[in-house]
Amino acid sequence: MNHTVQTFFSPVNSGQPPNYEMLKEEHEVAVLGAPHNPAPPTSTVIHIRSETSVPDHVVWSLFNTLFMNPCCLGFIAFAYSVKSRDRKMVGDVTGAQAYASTAKCLNIWALILGILMTILLIVIPVLIFQAYG
C-alpha cells in the first residue's frame, strides 16, 4: 500500500495572501451566465387561495326577523345565515355559499312581502275611510 500525505495548507504564513487558482468550472459559469438549453424555460405557478369573502347576511336576516317577519321568513333566513357563518368558520366555503344563497333568497322574499304588507295595511284603511267617511 502506498501511503502518501498531501498537505493542502502551507504551515508557514509569510504575510502574503495565498495564491488562488481559478477553476475552469467557475470561470465558465461567470462568462456564460445562464445555461443554454434547447428546451424553453418552464415556470411553476403556485395559486394561494386568499380567504374568500362569503356574505352571510346575518344583519339583514336579523332586521327581517325583528321588523318584517311575514310567514317567519326572516327567522328562517336568520337560521340559514347562522349556518352560513358556521360553515365559513369551519372553512367550508362551498357550504357557506350555499347557505348564504338560501338566506339571501329568503331575505328578499321576506323584504318584498313585508313591504307589500306594510303598504296594504296603510292603503286599505285609507280606502275604507274614504269610502265610508
Swiss-Prot record:
Transmembrane segments annotated in the record for this chain: 108-128
Complex and partners: Interacts with ATP6V0B. Interacts with CD81. Interacts with SPP1; the interaction reduces OPN expression. Interacts with VAPA. Interacts with BRI3 (isoforms 1 and 2); the interaction with isoform 2 is weaker than with isoform 1.
Record note on what altering residue 20 to A does: Loss of phosphorylation. Accumulates at the plasma membrane. Increases anti-HCV properties. Loss of anti-SARS-CoV-2 activity by enhancing Spike-mediated cell-to-cell fusion
Native species: Homo sapiens (Human)
Protein name according to UniProt: Interferon-induced transmembrane protein 3
Keywords: Antiviral defense, Cell membrane, Cytoplasm, Endosome, Immunity, Innate immunity, Isopeptide bond, Lipoprotein, Lysosome, Membrane, Palmitate, Phosphoprotein, Signal-anchor, Transmembrane, Transmembrane helix, Ubl conjugation
InterPro entries on file: CD225/Dispanin_fam, IFITM_antiviral_protein
Biological role stated in the UniProt entry: IFN-induced antiviral protein which disrupts intracellular cholesterol homeostasis. Inhibits the entry of viruses to the host cell cytoplasm by preventing viral fusion with cholesterol depleted endosomes. May inactivate new enveloped viruses which buds out of the infected cell, by letting them go out with a cholesterol depleted membrane.
GO cellular component terms, semicolon-separated: early endosome membrane; late endosome membrane; lysosomal membrane; perinuclear region of cytoplasm; plasma membrane; protein-containing complex
Induction pattern: By IFN-alpha and IFNG/IFN-gamma.
Effect after changing residue 105 to A: Loss of anti-HCV activity. Only localizes at the lysosome. No effect on SARS-CoV-2 infection. Loss of anti-influenza A virus activity
Region annotated Interaction with SPP1, chain positions: 60-93
Lipidation (S-palmitoyl cysteine): 71-72, 105
Taxonomy of the source species: Eukaryota, Metazoa, Chordata, Craniata, Vertebrata
Top-level taxon of the source organism: Eukaryota
Predominant place of localization: membrane
Cytoplasmic-side segments: 1-57, 79-107
